[in-house]
């Protein structure tokens, strides 16, 4: 779509994701799916270039509700493999109808456009430009992946939206982590709408420190992501046992994380957003693997809708708490928090009371143990700046600014990417099914996958429900 135009604009009340107050925002909806909000109505081009909120309504799901306020509507979609929601309200039912109709019209137009692109691409499967969006049917015409093709070995994690299981592919003997999400949580049963799956980001990402996606497929009641399995355990697990890492060990892990985030930002134009120790795994050799296993730990029922407090609040950046637009700099805040934990043995800000915790994140100055070296203090101070524009990595140079910091002075970044640096710790795993570095709370549990009403194959997907997840299925070419 070459000509981007404003479809609708006006004032909306947006509810904060974390501090649940309502804030007036002036929103612009564009025909490319962009849905951007400002504190004041933008008067010129310069003001339009710095929105507080920046969302996409592409193939979103819309829900109307009268709670927690009358004339509320909710936009729900998948961001990577995590469900996100944004809540708005207006003064009258007519206003709500105007907004939801406009949003649905834009989403439908984008869906048609994508289908036309898909039709064009599917005619030339050898064209790699469209490979990330091809169905399994295109990659392997005679075969569709089903749940029956895996042995289910051990539970690796569990949450509100589903579970992560260690599986073995029967045909190849290869081990993977399968993330299984329940459709009923993602798609309201009484809504005929489309849910965006940004799993194409995972499909098309190739980086040594990012978890690769091997397959994604759906059954009539589940979405399944089959991902590379790193059995060196969570960094959280290792840090919990050792309490603190040396600066050299933290530097090694930090460099691999920076390399991966640089790739996502510069090559994929993606903000990871959810950097925390639990999402950092080690592979069998001790290298970092950033995962997307994110399962919401707790679900909070809020009125008529399921409002989920996803993620660990200790990692939230100030701009996220203030409900401002967050760009790439949010990932550098996350890097600051995890590196602080590694080198200091505790979180930079902590309080069991969430409101007090948020106040600390927004207001409290960072403190360091006396044992920390000057370069480490300088790095962490830069990464944990409250103002994202002043943060290390917050400028146009992004990751390059962090790479040039004196804490990383001895790091050769190409060597990092090529895994030429020796890991400071090598996991003592004896086999691919060795889960000693995973929480026994999960691995000791029996695996239960509730039997569906009919065979769990792609063919059984009810044609009425299948369109909820268009172009969801995927198979990586070659080996993951």
Swiss-Prot record:
Disordered, as annotated region = 451-480
Q: What is the effect of changing residue 308 to A?
A: Inhibits insulin-induced activation of endogenous Akt1, insulin-stimulated protein synthesis, insulin-induced activation of glycogen synthase and insulin-induced phosphorylation of 4E-BP1 in a dominant negative manner when overexpressed
Site feature (Cleavage) residues: 462
> What does the PTM comment of the record read?
O-GlcNAcylation at Thr-305 and Thr-312 inhibits activating phosphorylation at Thr-308 via disrupting the interaction between AKT1 and PDPK1. O-GlcNAcylation at Ser-473 also probably interferes with phosphorylation at this site.
Cystine pairings recorded for this chain = 60-77, 296-310
| Domain Protein kinase stretches | 150-408
Provide the GO MF annotations for this entry. Answer: 14-3-3 protein binding; ATP binding; calmodulin binding; enzyme binding; GTPase activating protein binding; identical protein binding; kinase activity; kinase binding
Q: How is its activity regulated?
A: Three specific sites, one in the kinase domain (Thr-308) and the two other ones in the C-terminal regulatory region (Ser-473 and Tyr-474), need to be phosphorylated for its full activation.
Which reactions does this protein catalyse? L-seryl-[protein] + ATP = O-phospho-L-seryl-[protein] + ADP + H(+); L-threonyl-[protein] + ATP = O-phospho-L-threonyl-[protein] + ADP + H(+)
Q: Which InterPro entries match?
A: AGC-kinase_C, Akt1, Kinase-like_dom_sf, PH-like_dom_sf, PH_domain, PH_PKB, Pkinase_C, Prot_kinase_dom
The positions making up the signal sequence are none
Expression across tissues is: Widely expressed. Low levels found in liver with slightly higher levels present in thymus and testis.
Q: Where does ATP bind?
A: 156-164, 179
Asked whether the keyword Transport is assigned, the reply is yes
Where along the chain is the active site annotated?
A: 274
Indicate the cross-link positions, Glycyl lysine isopeptide (Lys-Gly) (interchain with G-Cter in ubiquitin).
284
Q: What positions does the domain AGC-kinase C-terminal occupy?
A: 409-480
Which protein family is named in the record? Answer: Belongs to the protein kinase superfamily. AGC Ser/Thr protein kinase family. RAC subfamily.
User: What is the protein's known function?
Assistant: AKT1 is one of 3 closely related serine/threonine-protein kinases (AKT1, AKT2 and AKT3) called the AKT kinase, and which regulate many processes including metabolism, proliferation, cell survival, growth and angiogenesis. This is mediated through serine and/or threonine phosphorylation of a range of downstream substrates. Over 100 substrate candidates have been reported so far, but for most of them, no isoform specificity has been reported.
Name of this chain's protein? RAC-alpha serine/threonine-protein kinase
